[in-house]
């Protein structure tokens, strides 16, 4: 048996964190049973005997080091599960936020509410596909013009398609585009219970693009757009073999990698815990319980290998995804036609509403440039009613 020796304070902090999680979620008995079965299954504390309890006690007396290792393993697994629950687990909810649920800052809410009302009045068609790993995926399709370009807009972490994609939907609708608003896995009407920060979502984005090409034909241009984790999703998708009619990507406030954003955010969710062991345990939880590794994807690497032009947008007052991450993604990108827009003073995921004039102009120019590169003439002009 391989036993990894770690400092005592590491185990104590793990046990404390595990206890807090179980107490808060009121799942102590179920979790103890779950981890007991997991440990036995893994052979950490495996004793096969008809008189199981007596054998456990006997083993504990005869093998104190094995017992200590089992206790430490339980604590680590418990902490791993706790961090997984906090950071990556989510039950999909079909509730749709009202305009009153928009960001609390009044300056943004006033600008977003009219667009939210317009989206709520727009007619959509529900669309369902199955991801490559069998997860059911759902989306809303808004048809505006036959033969128009299609914008597929991905929302962020624990977000809503009709909220995070609101700016993109509004802009693209004014341009006459058709719009597809997918629910990311573990969100909305899509299946799954694990948010993988783009690791698996990138393949979902490709699956939606493949569906769109099959449904609308290869002659219809497709744009992949995303905000926050949605931006990371489309950036990571840029590193895949996308359909040839995907002609542009818009990444609004995307991070550099699932690993880096997880390391950045964990201290905010779990103050007082050392980052190194906390991230290591959180990564273990993602692998064991979420079946993904945060280190299996890198947005900068995907951007560097993208064959599709990318428009990067980032607010320099972003407190969630650092502005420097957006700049790094842009700097490594080698795709022709790439652009970067700094929205001064914009907080996280509100650049479109913070400076609508600049955002609308720059994004519209980028989209039109992508269409021109593909020799696709779309008659709609840039919207002139920017706020």
Model-derived segments and spans:
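Catalytic histidine-centered segment of alpha/beta-hydrolase-like enzymes
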Residues: 346-357
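Catalytic nucleophile-loop/oxyanion-hole region of alpha/beta-hydrolase
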Residues: 161, 187-218
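Short alpha-helix in the alpha/beta-hydrolase fold that links the catalytic acid
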Residues: 308, 322-331
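Hydrolase active-site cap/lid region
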Residues: 236-292, 301-302
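An N-terminal hydrophobic leader/cap segment in hydrolases
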Residues: 67-129
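Short beta-strand/loop motif that positions the catalytic acidic residue
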Residues: 305-306, 312-314, 318
């Amino acid at each position: 048996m391989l036993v990894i020796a770690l400092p005592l304070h590491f185990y104590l902090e793990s046990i404390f964190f595990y206890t807090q999680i179980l107490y808060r979620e009121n799942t102590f008995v179920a979790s103890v049973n779950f981890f007991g079965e997991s440990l036995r299954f893994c052979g950490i504390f495996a004793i096969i005997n008809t008189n199981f309890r007596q054998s456990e006690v006997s083993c504990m007396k005869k093998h104190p080091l094995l017992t200590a290792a089992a206790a430490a393993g339980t604590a680590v697994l418990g902490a791993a599960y706790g961090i997984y629950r906090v950071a990556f687990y989510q039950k999909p909810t079909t509730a749709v936020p009202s305009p009153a649920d928009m960001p609390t800052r009044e300056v943004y809410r006033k600008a977003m509410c009219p667009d939210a009302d317009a989206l709520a009045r727009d007619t959509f068609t529900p669309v369902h596909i199955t991801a490559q790993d069998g997860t059911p995926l759902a989306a809303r399709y808004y048809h505006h013009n036959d033969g128009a370009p299609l914008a597929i807009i991905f929302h962020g972490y624990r977000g809503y398609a009709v909220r995070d994609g609101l700016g993109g939907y509004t802009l693209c609708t004014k341009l006459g585009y058709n719009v597809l608003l997918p629910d990311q896995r573990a969100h909305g009407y899509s299946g799954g219970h694990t948010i993988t920060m783009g690791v698996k979502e990138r393949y979902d984005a490709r699956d939606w693009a493949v569906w769109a090409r099959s449904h609308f034909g290869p002659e219809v241009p497709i744009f992949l757009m995303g905000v926050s984790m949605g931006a990371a999703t489309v950036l990571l998708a840029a590193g895949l073999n996308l359909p040839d009619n995907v002609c542009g990507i818009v990444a609004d406030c995307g991070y550099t990698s699932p690993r880096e954003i997880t390391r950045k955010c964990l201290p905010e969710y779990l103050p007082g815990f050392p980052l190194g062991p906390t991230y290591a345990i959180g990564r273990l939880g993602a692998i064991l319980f979420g079946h993904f590794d945060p280190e299996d994807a890198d947005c900068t690497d995907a951007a560097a290998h993208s064959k599709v032009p990318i428009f990067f947008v980032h607010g320099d007052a972003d407190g969630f995804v650092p502005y420097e991450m957006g700049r790094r993604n842009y700097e490594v990108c080698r795709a022709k036609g790439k652009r970067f827009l700094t929205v001064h003073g914009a907080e996280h995921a509100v650049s479109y509403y913070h400076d609508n004039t600049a955002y609308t102009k720059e994004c519209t120019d980028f989209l039109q440039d992508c269409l021109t590169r593909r020799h696709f003439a779309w008659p709609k002009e840039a919207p002139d009613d920017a706020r």
